[in-house]
Amino acid sequence: MKRTLILLAVLLLAMAATAQTPLLDSLQMPNAVRFLPPPPDTATAAFQYDRAQYRWGKEQRKDPVRLAIAVSDAVWSIDNICKIYSGVLGIDISRENTPAIYRMLTLGLLTTDQAGKLPKNHYMRTRPYVFFNEPTIYPSDEKWLRTNGSYPSGHTILGWSAALLLTEVAPDKADTILARGYMYGQSRVIAGYHWQSDVDAARLVASAAVARLHADKRFTKLIKKARKEYNKKRK
């Protein structure tokens, strides 16, 4: 009985340690409904560009390598982001190997994600796969994302925020990090889940969210620790 209670206590402590909440909520983040224009109306030239980019995305699926990347990028998780950018930085980003970088990314990305909630709920834009009634490359998300607004792209907020934050941690790898972050957003067009304008807007939302993060002293401390850890790991 005593052993069971000890194990239970350890489990509860582990769960408490891994549970993370955003540093700021959606109402504390910049409001994209106020600083960005609405998504393009279907009667505009901008929407015709969205349609053209949707066709471009379908063409990209013919490249098996690019298709595989887009499918992998469709997995929304901070651990997947860590895996993606581990290859770019040349170090294993994980809770065990790089705890400071992992914690910075976890709290940072959970917070920047908040910036997409207000505009998504406000516009509730129809996603391209729903608009065209066509399948995506990642069917498991199709059902629930039908009721989730398309503008701006939440995945792109995640991927571009990560790229910006890691550029601060590893400025020597800035170009490669940002190129991968850009590719991550384009994967959403290829997947059929987002219009190009959703992705473009999301990069601006992510940039605004990261700027807001830097006004929070708790986060600036996390960035400093992450940078110090990276400099030790790359030696």
Model-derived features with residue positions:
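Boundary at the C-terminal end of the N-terminal hydrophobic targeting segment
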Residues: 17-19
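C-terminal domain-closing interface element
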Residues: 202-224
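Hydrophobic alpha-helical bundle signature of multipass membrane enzymes
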Residues: 21-191, 212-215, 222, 231-235
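Histidine-centered divalent metal-coordination motifs
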Residues: 155, 194, 202
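Alpha-helical transmembrane segments and their juxtamembrane interfaces
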Residues: 12-13, 165, 208
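Sec-dependent N-terminal signal peptides
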Residues: 4-13
